[in-house]
């Protein structure tokens, strides 16, 4: 049921643990006149990245994401289903999922703080740096603050759910967004290689060596101006769906209530 969340979390873990690939940008020049597609990156193992499943650090994050997804789903049911029996079941299930989520997330996070990372200097040279992600948190206090607020918010949602509060999902959802954002910023900001290469260190991806052309970035900047409109539509759609609590009769029926 949660296979996708497990694989997604495992894949995100490789932003910190790395993958076996190489990047050769000279292929852009060598293949310019060939008329065929130019490949500048390739896997160095026949597993094509699936070896990430063999790294328990990646799997720990994958399991954390899997249990978190289930926990948030239960909190959503608690907030939107007007049935005391289903509410009680969702509450019990949420508490069951919260315990392994905390174990696996803390396992990954403690490892992250004490692990080495790859730093990039002004010349673009990539080198290993002990405790890189811990340094990132200390040198970017706003990211650390976002992470702290996010984690506390998720913990509060668990406590609220345990107390039987229906609004636990709002704390859980907001805390999840802040926590994920902080981890992604920690992976790529502060001169950090956000996708380390285990095969060749200098092939690791950074914001500097993997950015698109100036034209593409300008187009993306213009497109990003539509984000507020997309966010407004999402808010409207969710408000329409959640305007009235879901009842047992609605679950059994085929009609839409929005």
Enumerate the predicted regions with their spans:
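Conserved small/polar residues in nucleotide/adenosyl-binding loops
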Residues: 1-5
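Long hydrophobic alpha-helical segments that form multi-pass transmembrane helix bundles
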Residues: 10-87
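Membrane-helix interface motif
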Residues: 12-40, 110-124, 187-200
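Juxtamembrane membrane-water interface segments of multi-pass membrane proteins
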Residues: 17-20, 73-93, 111-133, 152-173, ...
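Hydrophobic alpha-helical transmembrane segments
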Residues: 40-68, 134-151, 210-230
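Hydrophobic membrane-spanning alpha-helices of multi-pass integral membrane proteins
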Residues: 96-107, 143-154, 172-186
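Hard-cation-handling environments
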Residues: 99-106, 112, 116, 140-143, ...
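Short, membrane-exposed interhelical loops at transmembrane-helix boundaries
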Residues: 127-130, 196-216
């Amino acid at each position: 049921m949660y296979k996708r969340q497990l694989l997604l979390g495992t894949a995100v873990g490789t932003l910190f643990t790395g993958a076996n690939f190489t990047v050769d940008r000279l292929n852009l020049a060598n293949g310019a006149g060939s008329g065929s597609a130019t490949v500048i990156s390739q896997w160095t193992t026949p597993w094509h990245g699936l070896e990430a499943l063999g790294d328990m650090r990646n799997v720990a994050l994958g399991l954390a994401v899997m249990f978190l997804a289930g926990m948030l789903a239960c909190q959503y049911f608690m907030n939107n289903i007007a049935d005391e029996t289903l509410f009680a079941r969702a509450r019990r299930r949420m508490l069951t999922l919260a315990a392994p989520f905390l174990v696996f997330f803390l396992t990954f996070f403690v490892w992250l703080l004490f692990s080495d990372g790859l730093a990039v200097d002004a010349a673009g040279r990539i080198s290993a740096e002990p405790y890189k992600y811990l340094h990132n948190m200390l040198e970017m206090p706003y990211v650390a603050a976002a992470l702290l607020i996010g984690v506390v918010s998720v913990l509060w949602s668990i406590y609220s759910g345990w107390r039987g509060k229906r609004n636990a999902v709002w704390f859980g959802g907001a805390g999840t967004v802040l926590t994920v954002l902080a981890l992604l910023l920690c992976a790529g900001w502060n001169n950090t290689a956000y996708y380390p290469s285990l095969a060749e260190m200098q092939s690791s991806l950074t914001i500097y060596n993997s950015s698109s052309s100036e034209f593409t970035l300008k187009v993306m900047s213009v497109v990003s101006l539509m984000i507020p409109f997309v966010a407004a539509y999402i808010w409207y759609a969710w408000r329409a769906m959640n305007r009235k609590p879901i009842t047992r009769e609605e679950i059994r029926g085929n009609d839409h209530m929005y």
